């Protein structure tokens, strides 16, 4: 997916239901035409085209609706407001430290936090960071207003009232940090001193607040995300053996690491340069699995120390953050390998093979299937499939390319969609005309049979599998009928034994497609077997070839086994031979 793409959404029914994504395209006019066509053909009650612009600095997309049409009037929503809608209202300063409040602040202030190389917990416990934040003015006020607008949409209070309430809460919380900094509540500590502090604080009601204040000071000396992560992980060595102090320090470290990993800027810096999203995800998976991560530019000390912690199943919140990030990226719109769909599919399979080994309490099987199904859905639309087939010169090559797609996507509905692209290729006149032009008929028929065999082995549902197989069989029948291939064998080879042996070899070599063509070949073969004197003549011929003699029953059994291998039941074979 390029830096800019256009998403087409539709709404079905006039009751104002939710919007569902139909397709993502790189061409603006093509996306608009597709949306208008859906309205004209009655495929949607309302449509919307959204321009998505990728911002490499944050790893996120900026959305802009460029077209809406249809009869259903739906209240327009701001995506950024929707992202904040789950924010639980805060009624006292302590509520600002809750998990949901911190996650909301991370989403709203992500860009600013990334530039400052801060986590939200550091910001909320550092007087110097809060002074810098207040000095921005607009960033602070915009954050408050965004939350207020989201809350006002779900309450009877006005935006102005909620802004005032949030400003009062934030001011109280900020001034508390300033006051505690002045009275030196947050000790400036070095490694080796945090364990004793955690033990001392124990079950104190303000223990987490005080410890985080000291951790924020300690991390303030780190100039890079890697240095910050390494400084945190060093503290794992001084965890108290047991008791409230151990849980206190471990949870504080885990939370700070998780916040780093939830930030796009921090994670990108920790993983180093990657050529594309696919390779970045591979590194994420390696990290999640607790194996060595190959980070460019000689960095990676922090990320590999974290991998070692994950290998010991430590830091569950941080590991869950990585799992969530992997799933989010898999479900996202950005291509794994933008320059090549072949590489895209290889990368998708590679990621799948690794993640299967990692499923468990952090990554469920259902979540993985849902993520891969969502990504697969974006690959079975017109634009990527046409791009994937553009190097194919003939229709059979296009069909083969689509079978490669089938092998690398997940989801029954996605495979059903893919089958709708395959049937028209097979039923087109070009399919037979372009199929190994100039090659001998057996070679052309074998090519169709090989494609059919791949379809029958595929993961298509039985309905789609049978439809494609029947279409290929029909194409093979037309090729055979046009060349009068079987008729020529019957006319050219008068000897029933030679004719039967020829047909048996052709069937065993996979020349004929399963279905009507194979049945036609079997009927011709059975007719040869049923010729008077076939068996006695066949045995006499074998006796000439084998001076040691032959056993009649053994000959019949061998022949029946060969015939069973091409789908003729032993009883039918024996009946024909006895004629």
Report the location of each language-model feature.
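Charged, amphipathic alpha-helical segments
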Residues: 27-37
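Surface-exposed loop/edge segments in extracytoplasmic proteins
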Residues: 15-22, 56-61
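Short, mixed-charge low-complexity intrinsically disordered segments
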Residues: 40-123
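Generic structural motif
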Residues: 11-14, 28, 52-54
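Short aromatic-glycine-(Arg/Gly/Cys) micro-motifs in beta-strand/loop hairpins
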Residues: 1-20
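Phosphoinositide-binding peripheral membrane targeting modules
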Residues: 20-26, 41-43
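Non-catalytic all-alpha helical scaffold/repeat segments
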Residues: 101, 105-579
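Short linear motifs in intrinsically disordered
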Residues: 1, 36-41
